[in-house]
Amino acid sequence: MSRIIREAKQTDMPDIMKVMEAAKKIMRSSGNMHQWGEGYPSEAVITSDMEKNGGFVIEDEGRVVGYFAFLPSPEPTYHKIYDGKWLDDELPYHVVHRIASYPDAHHIFSDMIDFCFAHDTNIRIDTHRDNTIMQHNLQKQGFTYCGIIYLASGDERLAYQRIAK
């Protein structure tokens, strides 16, 4: 199988939005009923990722099977963390957002994490409390739970970090 990760292009948008809808179905079927409500992530959000050179697609045999945003610090919602602390609060970091894939696309998360750590050694990710699939994947990939952050909307997220040695 030929899998590549590359920067997303505007022409990928229809495929990216299909991946997002598939990811929402996975969330709902696993009991995560509240993360990624109607209209999120929107095409405008994905376009913003692309404009920051931070939108990436994962392709298998030329088919877009996944998407994620990989953006440099600072992440405004990460300035304050509750009930814990970041592993390191001095070093620059990258944040990963909007991770999505088709259910039949295997090893997407580990491939994405390998890609991210090839570009930075300090990665932060947050997820919804109900997103047990993501929490499991983060722990499996060596991320440490650091505490709680709040989005600009006021919604709570569980915050994780991993620093490569």
Residue spans of the language-model regions?
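Conserved beta-hairpin
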Residues: N53-F68
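Conserved acyl-donor/pantetheine-binding loop and adjacent beta-alpha core of acyl/acetyltransferases
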Residues: A69-D104
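Conserved GNAT-fold acetyl-CoA-binding loop/helix
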Residues: K25-A44
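A short helix-loop-beta-strand connector motif used in the catalytic cores of GNAT acetyltransferases and
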Residues: A44-V57, P74-T77
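Conserved acetyl-CoA-binding loop-helix of GNAT-fold acetyltransferases
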Residues: S101-A118, H136-K140
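Conserved active-site alpha-helix within GNAT-family acetyltransferase domains
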Residues: D130-G147, D155
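A short beta-loop-alpha structural element at the N-terminal edge
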Residues: I4-V19
